[in-house]
A protein has these predicted regions:
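Short loop/beta submotifs within extracellular cysteine-rich repeat domains
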Residues: 96-97, 148, 203-204
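Long, His/Glu/Asp-enriched segments that create or flank divalent metal/ion-associated functional microenvironments
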Residues: 28, 32-41, 45-47, 170-232
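Extended, compositionally biased non-globular segments
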Residues: 126-201
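Conserved small/polar residues in nucleotide/adenosyl-binding loops
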Residues: 233-238
Length: 245
């Protein structure tokens, strides 16, 4: 379908061009990584012995976001994410919208693009603590929808981490129109994570959606913990005269 849309496009579109890559030696007692990616899809898992599993960056896209002609007309990809975000911003009061909706041009793509390492974006938007009880449930449902694109054990760990960090300061930002079909962007930013969603290209029918971890993309935080533990073990062993080289 995309090949038909992008006549004479820059790239050859082929549904078989998705690749699984293994880095390192997969085992329970080693550090290794697994990547599955292709156009509009990127999963990254880093397995760190004795520490845990990192699951970001995570990227999804769809062009078109909604099929508008032919026998698949009406089919939507990433529909739940778009609808949950729009339902939340539409539920806000006037004052709440003043905090959540930024009066700037809609970006042409997500702000973090394909950066290998990211930092928190501007601390703007409406806070979880400034939502009513129904809106709070809507925001958590939006976050959970993105977390649940992972296996259950990882999704549950993500949500547990987010709750343990505290929900009150999580920020929701919207840019653009709130009616269906309007070019729009939204993000959810917490202490350790960032969700960005953009639907502005191709007449607002082309989605980019990403989950990032400020410290843990590609397992950076887990690898750091692993090496700190190794250094501590080596130091303790040397102190005890165990002859560890």
């Amino acid at each position: 379908m995309l090949a038909e849309i992008e006549v004479n496009g820059r790239f050859d579109r082929d549904p078989d061009l998705y690749f699984l890559t293994v880095f390192g030696d997969p085992s329970l007692d080693s550090n290794w990584a697994l990547r599955y990616e292709g156009h509009h899809l990127a999963y990254n898992w880093t397995f760190v012995s004795g520490v845990g599993i990192a699951s970001s960056p995570q990227f999804f896209g769809s062009n078109p976001a909604e099929v508008r002609a032919g026998n698949k007309a009406g089919t939507r990809v990433l529909a739940a994410e778009e609808d949950l975000g729009r339902d939340l911003v539409s539920s806000l009061s006037g004052d709440q919208k003043g905090a959540a909706i930024l009066d700037i041009d809609v970006p042409g793509d997500i702000f973090t693009a394909a950066e290998k390492e990211i930092s928190p974006l501007e601390n703007s938007g409406i806070s979880y603590q400034d939502l009513d009880s129904r809106q709070k449930r809507m925001l958590i449902a939006l976050i959970d929808e993105l977390a649940s694109m992972q296996p259950d054990v990882i999704a549950e760990a993500r949500m547990e981490t987010i709750r343990s960090e505290g929900l009150d300061d999580i920020k929701f930002v919207w840019i653009g129109g709130i009616e269906t079909g309007d070019p729009h962007y939204f993000r959810v930013q917490g202490a350790s994570f960032l969700i960005e969603y953009d639907n502005t290209q191709n007449n607002a029918n082309h989605i980019h959606l990403v989950w990032r971890d400020f410290a843990g993309d590609f397992g950076r935080d887990l690898i750091r913990m692993h090496y700190q533990a190794c250094l501590l073990y080596t130091s303790d062993a040397a102190d005890e005269g165990l002859g560890v080289d």
